[in-house]
Amino acid sequence: MKKNIYKINKNRLYHKLINNKLVYDNKALNRYKIDGNNISTMSTNVKESLLSDLKDKIKSIRNCELKKNATNLVFSDGNPFSKIMIIGEGPGANEDKEGKPFVGRAGKLLDKMLESIKLNRKNVYISNVVNFRPPQNRKPTDEEIGRYLPFLKKHIEIVKPKILLLLGSTALNAIIGNEIVISKARGKWIYKKIGDIETNVIASFHPAFLMRQPDQKKYAWEDLKMI
């Protein structure tokens, strides 16, 4: 199609997207039956070794203000063999202290959100766009996102999720592009090639935003029902 614009009827997603192969008719996926070309045949030892190597590379990053001001590297939580991977923005104070993503108030809300669709941390895998806490819990800058994005994409390639849930505008823009707004893109499926894998991507509001804007929780619930 000209200019890589997917024109679909008004009930479907309509965006200019970069490097995307297909935009779905916006229907819920059955996570129990979903399949794909990137079925992981990777052994437990191989995947754990690749993740450990990636973690070491992030630990050894140099000349990084985020790393210099942080207490801990926040790499991941959950099951790396899950079909579902969740990407947030970056660690907060509690995450920096414990070295795990989503363990503060936003994390407790995320747990409730997952429970509402019969999921928990044992059957999803969670990470962030940046792996060290931005000072004062600010949003990471474009430069910081750009520096950590290759690590994030490699992380996704290793895990090979069938479903990638992006929480918040930072995660959405890092993976899909800056031309898309979370309020317009949320709850809509995109088939996305990331490195050497293809996966089903959906975005929703970040739990921290939902705590500030509780009236938006009903929309997040609609998004989760798509999974």
Regions found by a protein language model. Give the residues of each.
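A polyanion-binding, active-site-adjacent surface
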Residues: 2, 6, 10-227
